[in-house]
């Protein structure tokens, strides 16, 4: 009976060791939990970015002001009847 009890105790200790320190044990589970949390944060950040981009696309599709602003800043366009003045500073004046 003692040998059976000793064998079962040894088996229990071995299984506990696997649970705590083995592959797929609690350390791995903690690491995976941290990884999942980091990925959730990344997904939330990307969702917010997508929402901002979607709002910008909708604004460009429907709003003429945003379209005009982009045309002016990125393409250098001006309205009909406007005069464009570009002021260039001389190096002497820059000091």
UniProtKB/Swiss-Prot annotation:
Stored InterPro entries: Cell_div_FtsB (IPR023081), FtsL/DivIC (IPR007060)
Pfam hit, one: DivIC
Membrane-related topology note: Single-pass type II membrane protein
Sequence ranges on the Cytoplasmic membrane side: 1-3
Primary subcellular site in the record, as a coarse category: membrane
Ranges in the topological domain labelled Periplasmic: 22-95
UniProt keyword list: Cell cycle, Cell division, Cell inner membrane, Cell membrane, Coiled coil, Membrane, Transmembrane, Transmembrane helix
GO cellular component: cell division site; cell septum; plasma membrane
Coiled-coil parts of chain: 26-76
A single BP term in Gene Ontology: FtsZ-dependent cytokinesis
Disulfide bridge partners, by residue number: none
Stretches that traverse the bilayer: 4-21
Top-level taxon: Bacteria
Location(s), subcellular: Cell inner membrane
Assembly: Part of a complex composed of FtsB, FtsL and FtsQ.
Function: Essential cell division protein. May link together the upstream cell division proteins, which are predominantly cytoplasmic, with the downstream cell division proteins, which are predominantly periplasmic.
HAMAP family with a match to the protein in the record: FtsB (MF_00599)
Recorded family membership: Belongs to the FtsB family.
UniProt xrefs under NCBIfam families: PRK00888.1 (NF002058)
Name of this protein: Cell division protein FtsB
Gene expressing this chain: ftsB
